């Protein structure tokens, strides 16, 4: 089978599992892969190719010319429209149109790619430091979903018993000792969303567009209307660099040279793509997280799993279902069942039915014990 080596390696290190939904994979795998790939491409263009070439005076020798280009590449340059006079360029214009990103674009993209992996890393850390083996339930559901009912029955009972034990047991001491799994899961989901929004803002600040977070849309419309960088100054190909030359007499001579930043041709396309990608990522992550949360919280989730045993003749069954979901399963149990449901609706339903039977038995035992206790109190008063 055809595979991309880097993507395969990234997948294995991130450990994409059954408990990761599509929005998680989109963020921690696909987005990270895109950013890191872009970082590799831009670094090759920046540090291997010719990122900047300057138009230098003829008096500059080869070494002087190379020194001047390296200096201008490391030092921030500024954009100034070529159709305007170059005499006495205001300092405020130089500061406002200063380019500070082209040297660091590959590093930024690499760091951003790593940042998208952080929520996944924390989710894996939480899995390894708690007593809730969520992956086990998903893997088991995936294994038995195509088995016959007889072969599946034993595993269903085992899963239900194991889930009941884990939900009701006290966690071993760890970083997440007093935090329920659903709370950890919710925090991780929020981190995915916060990370996407933060990167949307950071990319604007990095490119010097902090006053216009919608610079990507502006650039896109400019390209459609034939308005180029020569007018807007967005990702300019030609900039200017100021430096001083120390002469033998001890005097310093100010020089201004015109430089071509070839990497900006590439940066324009890369960062425009990522602007649209981050907009898509923010909205898709937001929608996915609200949808997943709503699916677990609303009563229909439990009703759908217990559909096979619904009896409309039982007056208080809805109340029993509600008590089963809120007090017996708790949010942790419903979260696990949602993961199991993502692998097999049938297995999730059968596990829920098995646990509901245990819930009714435990409820009956509790009622009997309560009646005995009340009778003892009543007889004692007599």
Swiss-Prot record:
Belongs to the pannexin family. The chain crosses the membrane at residues 29-49, 103-123, 187-207, 270-290. The lineage of its organism: Eukaryota, Metazoa, Ecdysozoa, Nematoda, Chromadorea. Structural component of the gap junctions. One of its GO terms (molecular function) is gap junction hemi-channel activity. It is found in: Cell membrane; Cell junction, Gap junction. Keywords: Cell junction, Cell membrane, Gap junction, Ion channel, Ion transport, Membrane, Transmembrane, Transmembrane helix, Transport. This is Innexin-8.
């Amino acid at each position: 089978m055809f595979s991309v080596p880097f993507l395969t390696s990234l997948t294995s290190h991130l450990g994409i599992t059954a408990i990761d939904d599509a929005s998680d994979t989109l963020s921690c795998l696909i987005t990270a892969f895109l950013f890191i790939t872009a970082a590799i491409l831009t670094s090759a263009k920046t540090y291997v190719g010719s990122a900047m070439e300057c138009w230098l005076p003829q008096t500059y020798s080869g070494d002087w010319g190379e020194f001047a280009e390296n200096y201008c590449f490391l030092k921030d340059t500024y954009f100034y429209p070529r159709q305007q006079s170059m005499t006495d360029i205001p300092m405020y214009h130089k500061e406002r149109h200063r380019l500070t990103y082209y040297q660091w674009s590959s590093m930024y993209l690499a760091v951003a790619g790593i940042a998208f992996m952080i929520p996944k890393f924390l989710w894996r850390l939480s899995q390894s430091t708690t007593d809730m083996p969520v992956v086990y339930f998903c893997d088991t559901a995936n294994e038995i979903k195509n088995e016959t009912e007889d072969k599946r029955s034993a595993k269903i009972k085992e899963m239900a018993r194991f889930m009941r034990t884990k939900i009701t047991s006290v966690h071993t001491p760890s970083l997440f000792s007093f935090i329920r799994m659903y709370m950890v899961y919710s925090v991780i989901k929020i981190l995915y969303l916060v990370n996407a929004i933060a990167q949307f803002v950071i990319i604007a600040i990095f490119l010097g567009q902090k006053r216009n977070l919608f610079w990507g849309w502006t650039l896109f419309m400019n390209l459609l209307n034939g308005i180029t960088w020569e007018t807007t100054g967005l990702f300019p190909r030609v900039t200017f660099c100021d430096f001083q030359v120390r002469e033998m007499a001890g005097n310093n001579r100010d020089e201004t040279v015109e430089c071509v930043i070839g990497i900006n041709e590439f940066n324009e396309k890369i960062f425009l793509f990522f602007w649209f990608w981050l907009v898509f990522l923010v909205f898709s992550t937001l929608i996915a997280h609200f949808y997943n949360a709503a699916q677990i919280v609303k009563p229909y989730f439990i009703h759908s799993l217990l559909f096979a045993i619904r009896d409309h003749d039982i007056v208080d069954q809805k109340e029993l279902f509600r008590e089963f979901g809120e007090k017996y399963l708790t949010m942790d149990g419903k979260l696990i069942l949602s993961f199991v449901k993502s692998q097999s609706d049938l297995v999730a339903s059968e596990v829920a039915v098995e646990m509901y039977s245990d819930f009714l038995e435990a409820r009956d035992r509790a009622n009997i014990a309560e009646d005995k206790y009340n009778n003892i109190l009543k007889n004692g008063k007599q």
